[in-house]
Amino acid sequence: MELCSQASFSDAHECTSIPIIAANVQRMIKPSQSQIWAVLRAKDDVHRTYYSLISGFLGRLCISGEIFDLPEENWQIALDSIKFYDEIKHIIKNGFTSVIECNVEDYNDPEGYQIVLRQTENEAILIVHTFKNGANPPIEKHLENWKVQKE
């Protein structure tokens, strides 16, 4: 990665293991150099739209798919997510990943949760993905000493 500025993190752009792979790749490629593709489909519900976009927060958010055919609500979610990404991209670029906590055992049928904390000296972004049977992960310990700005 010293010879190029960016690389696509994986070919797994539409599977449920996107955030798991993207977090693992952070151990070898800086998130600022890792393109994470959010593939948006017109048939996706709002939960899937959020899931795909927030996965992109684990690196350089890239968007593809049927963006011109998205329902209005999903398009607004995409616009809001891009705006929020713009507010936190300096943490992705200049920060360090201090926590990758994932209790998933099967990438093809993930159950559980994943928590990723990326921080600078004064700011942090906590990215949480839940999978089947993964509701209410233990995030409180990762929020200690931080003031929550947005949820």
Regions found by a protein language model. Name each.
Residues 53-102:
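Catalytic cores of secreted or luminal carbohydrate-active enzymes
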Residues 30, 94-95, 145-147:
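Glycine-centered flexibility motif
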Residues 5-7, 67, 103-106, 117:
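Solvent-exposed, flexible loop/coil residues
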Residues 105-148:
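Carbohydrate-binding surface patches
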Residues 1-69:
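Glycan-recognition surfaces
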Residues 4-8, 75, 144-148:
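Short, low-complexity, polar/charged sequence segments that are solvent-exposed and flexible
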Residues 56, 126, 151:
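Hydrophobic, well-ordered secondary-structure elements that form the walls
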